[in-house]
């Protein structure tokens, strides 16, 4: 073996090593409140960085196009079986590389180009892959969006039913990326049946809450369910499709060879690990704490005078109308970043501002909950957010908040053994 094959990352590529070290430091020292982000376990990290990254395994367990796949088969079978057990699904395909890939492949299995999709408007909390005109979904299929009411900022199911009966979509899609309330899966399935449509749910954001029993499951109601495996599920950045058995063959065929070649076996291994972790009793505690933390944080911000979209949250995320407080979402994101608090700017329902300068910010609690923070910390975080936004043009004030944030993060260390090893080698 050449010397290069045994060199450490520091030796081979100090620039990348430094970037990784800096990112590790950033994650440790700041409050991660982006709703789609989380911290995986050391076990998930190890699986994702394993020698399975070397292995090609086109096909499915027992039906590969390459030799030497016996252990890849073990990994994928474990991932599939655990996913089915965890979510009570009849079929699981764990090969999608991302949530967007999973949606593309699910559509490919149940739709033809030009078919109609009824999906939640992106501006009302949906996702790009649910029909945005710049996305493949909007370019490939006819899109009819449904939305929320101005009064409650929650889904208007009467309008949804009216649209379904008028347009007769091939599929109705539930789920989104910035909707803080629980979808009424039972009613959506009833509407789909009445309109002669299939019902698909994208549970990427709340899959971990479903796994932990803190959120209703769409699996009994939907024909097809897609998800990411990160976010609240706390696994690697990837995707998955669950379905009724009648759609299994079509989904598998579209995924491979239809849209993907070799699966990422190292990531599938990490998925299997995260599914096992999600079956443990402690994960139920985690999922329920995520929701409890979100409710307390939303209330803390409301107490500080900020308007919470729909009046609160039932999930891990909330949308804050910062435009009503005199600023753009982009300004709020920047100010909070300087205070050591990471959020993302986000459009709110009926937003009249452009996407890069929207009226809101999206906030979520999965990552802070993973660190062990609970209700008292959420109240304090809400105060820091509010004060930082009020003093957003005062760098000295934001610096003081950042130091307080750093102290709190030190009390809830992230990957302590990893940090100790790194510090010992400096």
UniProtKB/Swiss-Prot annotation:
PROSITE patterns recorded for this chain? SHMT
Its job = Catalyzes the reversible interconversion of serine and glycine with tetrahydrofolate (THF) serving as the one-carbon carrier. This reaction serves as the major source of one-carbon groups required for the biosynthesis of purines, thymidylate, methionine, and other important biomolecules. Also exhibits THF-independent aldolase activity toward beta-hydroxyamino acids, producing glycine and aldehydes, via a retro-aldol mechanism.
Report the CDD domains cross-referenced here.
SHMT
Q: Where does (6S)-5,6,7,8-tetrahydrofolate bind?
A: 122, 126-128
Q: What broad taxonomic lineage does this protein's source fall under?
A: Bacteria, Pseudomonadati, Acidobacteriota, Terriglobia, Terriglobales
Q: Which organism is it from?
A: Koribacter versatilis (strain Ellin345)
Could you say which enzyme class this protein belongs to?
A: transferase
According to UniProt, this protein's pathway is: One-carbon metabolism; tetrahydrofolate interconversion; Amino-acid biosynthesis; glycine biosynthesis; glycine from L-serine: step 1/1
| Protein name as annotated | Serine hydroxymethyltransferase
């Amino acid at each position: 073996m050449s010397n290069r094959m045994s060199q450490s990352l520091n030796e081979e590529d100090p620039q990348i090593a430094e970037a990784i070290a800096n990112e590790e430091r950033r994650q440790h020292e700041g409050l991660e409140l982006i709703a789609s982000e989380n911290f995986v376990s050391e076990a998930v990290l190890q699986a994702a960085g394993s020698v399975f990254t070397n292995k090609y395994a086109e096909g499915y367990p027992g039906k590969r196009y390459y030799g030497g796949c016996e252990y890849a088969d073990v990994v994928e079978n474990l991932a599939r079986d655990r996913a089915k057990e965890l979510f009570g699904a009849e079929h699981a395909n764990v090969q999608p590389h991302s949530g967007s890939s999973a949606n593309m492949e699910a559509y490919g299995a149940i739709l033809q180009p030009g078919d109609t999709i009824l999906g939640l408007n992106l501006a009302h909390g949906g996702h790009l892959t649910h029909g945005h005109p710049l996305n493949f979904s909007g370019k490939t299929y006819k899109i009819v969006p449904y939305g929320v009411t101005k009064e409650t900022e929650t889904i208007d199911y009467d309008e949804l039913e009216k649209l379904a009966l008028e347009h007769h979509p091939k599929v109705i899609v539930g789920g989104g990326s910035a909707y803080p309330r629980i979808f009424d899966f039972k009613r959506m399935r009833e509407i789909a049946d009445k309109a002669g449509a299939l019902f698909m749910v994208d549970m990427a954001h709340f899959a971990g809450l479903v796994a932990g029993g803190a959120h209703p499951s769409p699996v009994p109601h939907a024909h097809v369910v897609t998800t990411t495996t990160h976010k609240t599920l706390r696994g690697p950045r990837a995707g998955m499709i669950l379905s009724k058995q009648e759609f299994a063959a079509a989904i598998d065929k579209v995924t491979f060879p239809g849209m993907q070649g070799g699966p990422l076996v190292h990531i599938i291994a990490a998925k299997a690990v995260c599914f096992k972790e999600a079956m443990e009793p402690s994960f139920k505690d985690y999922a329920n704490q995520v929701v409890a933390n979100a409710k307390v944080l939303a209330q803390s911000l409301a107490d500080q005078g900020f308007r919470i979209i729909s009046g609160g949250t039932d999930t891990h995320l909330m949308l804050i109308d910062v435009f009503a407080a005199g600023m753009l979402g982009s300004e709020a994101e920047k100010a909070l970043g300087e205070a050591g608090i990471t959020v993302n700017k986000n459009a709110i329902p009926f937003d009249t501002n452009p996407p890069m300068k929207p009226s809101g910010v999206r906030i979520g609690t999965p990552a802070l909950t993973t660190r062990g923070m609970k209700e008292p910390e959420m109240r304090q975080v809400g105060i820091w957010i509010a004060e930082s936004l009020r003093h957003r043009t005062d760098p000295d004030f934001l610096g003081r908040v950042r130091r307080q944030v750093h102290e709190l993060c030190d009390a809830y260390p992230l990957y302590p053994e990893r940090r100790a090893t790194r510090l010992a080698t400096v």
